[in-house]
A protein has these predicted regions:
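Mid-to-C-terminal secondary-structure elements
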Residues: 126-142, 146, 151-249
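Peri-transmembrane interface segments
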Residues: 223, 235, 249-283
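Short cytosolic juxtamembrane segments of multi-pass membrane proteins
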Residues: 3-7, 398-413
């Protein structure tokens, strides 16, 4: 029965080749639009994941502030001051932490020959390279020996190197930081940078050497990474430990600011889901245009074959047989158009390659380049949308054909 129905649908399509071909093209363009829009949403999501990964996904930064609640006998408004004791406290009491570093920041005058700039200088332990995913593009990062020897060595971020040295080689050269000479031992790869953000203008020096530039007794922040998945539970544990040490309420967000990359990723995923739903709706509207064309073509086909339908009913064809024959014809046209549309989408995605729509708004955004990612989930969603549109578009003419009165249909010329 199904084979006969498919054969009849194929015969009808061959009889109306031009109309069927145009309808297939409309459905192909519609499904290609759906697939490409969903692929663009996937590409945006993957690009942002790459950007977050370049900063270290499982990373937290602790920044001291001022209390806004009374706790432990302390009045609100007391300032928190981090020291190296806090680093040791966290290392011993929070086993989920894998690497941790103190951090001291200073805005300094940087000189090389006749060039002078004001850049941020940061003193960290050598493991900051792993914590913040600092990848040298040239040379190396400072190590534990440099730290122990208080070596005056510096690692330049990409934009700092360009401003100081332009296209010249920086490795092995000496720069002056607040009048003190430092040897450049490495240059970092560029990171994602929005607007006037200075992440690519920072200069890194060993934490002990930073003591030659400023007081390192009190820390500006503490950074660490971890391996567990429950980052919210880890944040609560960190707040509890620090609250006991500094006598503040653990829920006081003003006393201790915790910046978590995973928390930003969670918020971003919600935004991406809404974005992908919007793109799917736009694609569905485009595909629905092809569905309207399919419905019109099928209605014309019903009108042209009214006498034929009456003859079949007179010979014993049931109402449901006529209904399924026209519905199968509509689904066949949609299926062939869908296959052509997916092939078109793959061809466009392959030829376009990388899109730099996001990069155009940011500096050094190689990680933010967008690829059109067509995954199995995209094809499943597109297939479901195509099936829904095809069913809605095909049922109207199928119902009309199945309800034709055979006597009236036989009279139709």
């Amino acid at each position: 029965m199904l084979t006969d129905t498919l054969h009849e649908a194929w015969t009808a399509m061959r009889y109306n080749r031009r109309s069927a071909a145009l309808t297939m093209l409309a459905m192909a363009w519609g499904i290609a639009t759906v697939v490409l829009l969903l692929a663009y949403g996937n590409g945006c999501a993957q690009a942002m994941i790459n950007i977050f990964a370049s900063f270290g996904t499982k990373t937290m930064i602790l920044v001291p502030g001022r209390t806004s609640m009374q706790a432990g006998g302390q009045k609100a408004g007391a300032a928190l001051r981090f020291t190296l004791d806090d680093v040791d406290l966290l290392r011993m009491n929070v086993p989920q932490i894998s690497r941790i570093t103190p951090e001291v920041y200073k805005s300094s005058t940087i000189q090389y020959e006749s060039r002078t700039f004001n850049f941020g200088v940061v003193g960290d332990h050598p493991n900051v390279a792993s914590i913040r995913v600092l990848v040298p593009a040239q040379g190396r990062f400072y190590n534990i020996e440099d730290q122990l020897q208080r070596a005056r060595v510096a690692v330049l971020s990409s934009e700092a190197k360009e401003k100081l040295f332009s296209g010249r080689n920086a490795q092995g050269e000496c720069i002056r930081i607040d009048g003190l000479s430092f040897e450049v031992i490495g240059v970092l790869s560029a990171k994602m940078q929005e607007g006037d953000d200075d992440i690519n203008r920072i200069i890194y020096v060993p934490f002990t050497t930073m003591g030659d530039l400023t007081d390192i007794h009190f820390l500006d922040s503490i950074g660490f990474n971890y391996e567990v998945n429950d980052y919210q539970g880890l944040e609560r544990a960190v707040r509890a430990v620090m609250a006991i040490q500094h006598k503040f309420n653990p829920v006081d967000r003003h006393a201790l600011s915790v910046y978590s990359v995973m928390d930003q990723i969670r918020q971003f995923r919600g935004m991406v889901l809404g974005f992908k739903i919007l793109l799917a709706l736009i694609g569905t509207i485009t595909l629905a245009t092809g569905g309207v064309g399919l419905m019109n073509i099928m209605l014309v086909s019903v009108a042209q074959r009214t006498h034929e339908i009456g003859m079949e009913k007179a010979l014993g064809s049931r109402q449901r047989d006529v209904f399924f024959r026209f519905l199968t014809e509509a689904l066949t046209i949609s299926f062939i158009g869908g296959v052509l549309g997916v092939m078109l989408a793959y061809a466009i995605a392959h030829s376009v390659g990388r899109l730099t729509l996001y990069s155009a708004m940011a500096k050094h955004a190689e990680a933010g380049d967008i690829r059109l990612l067509i995954d199995p989930g995209t094809l499943v969603i597109a297939g479901l949308i195509l099936t829904a549109v095809a069913l809605v578009s095909g049922m109207v003419p199928a119902i009309r054909a199945s309800r034709l009165d055979p006597i009236e249909a036989l009279r139709y010329e």
